[in-house]
UniProtKB/Swiss-Prot annotation:
Pfam families: vATP-synt_AC39. The keyword tRNA-binding does not apply. One of its GO terms (molecular function) is proton-transporting ATPase activity, rotational mechanism. The gene is atpC. This is V-type ATP synthase subunit C. It comes from Thermus thermophilus (strain ATCC 27634 / DSM 579 / HB8).
Amino acid sequence: MADDFAYLNARVRVRRGTLLKESFFQEALDLSFADFLRLLSETVYGGELAGQGLPDVDRAVLRTQAKLVGDLPRLVTGEAREAVRLLLLRNDLHNLQALLRAKATGRPFEEVLLLPGTLREEVWRQAYEAQDPAGMAQVLAVPGHPLARALRAVLRETQDLARVEALLAKRFFEDVAKAAKGLDQPALRDYLALEVDAENLRTAFKLQGSGLAPDAFFLKGGRFVDRVRFARLMEGDYAVLDELSGTPFSGLSGVRDLKALERGLRCVLLKEAKKGVQDPLGVGLVLAYVKEREWEAVRLRLLARRAYFGLPRAQVEEEVVCP
């Protein structure tokens, strides 16, 4: 193993060559489920596709992503490993928040979109099967995951799901920001600052009309969303989004619901992450690759469901295309 990015980036360049082309997704928008399975079997996901059902597609996507992304920290040591680990920890936060929502709504584990992070699928399944969020924290504590401590602390403050998610993000990003400052990786720091902005926008939408104090949920460390804008958006002042013209978030002007916001944020973060290909000697190339793989997983699951349930193209097209 190497302690810099030269070796890792060489491996990542090869793996980027297995990313699915845009033509795959355009073709898949019109396919039956059987034809979608055939097309998927001819890709890098085919080796893990062991059945003919929707759960088999999800399993193939999850396991392929784990192989092609989850092992990246193990390919390097030192600062390079820590930088990659911070990227994948962000996915662990996503996974924990997704499992908390699934538990609260009775959604089965198989329907949860897990992103490749630092933990195996089996650990997330055990967390899902825990009796309550406190039990989930206990499961995460076994491998010594930092989110276990964060979840325990948050649960001492509130049991409300929206507040739990927001406070988890606050603790997570505060810890990650501290760790990132110690690394000589400007591409990582700049990207994480955008993630903080995105999380603040997301949280403000979720907590609109709650009457809660903004200071308890506002994340420091962003570039474009300050505390004043955060508080205004929590109060329903959508002019905040118009004020972001000239920033990476300019495309959010006019957004009024959480679903549209999530879709817009996903595309903004993907676009900014892909600029990392211009950072061949640092973590930027890995950042671009990780986010491209994530987007690929999201699109595959959505297209599989469109084909399986026979949904019209127009119903999912805007969900699987980033301008």
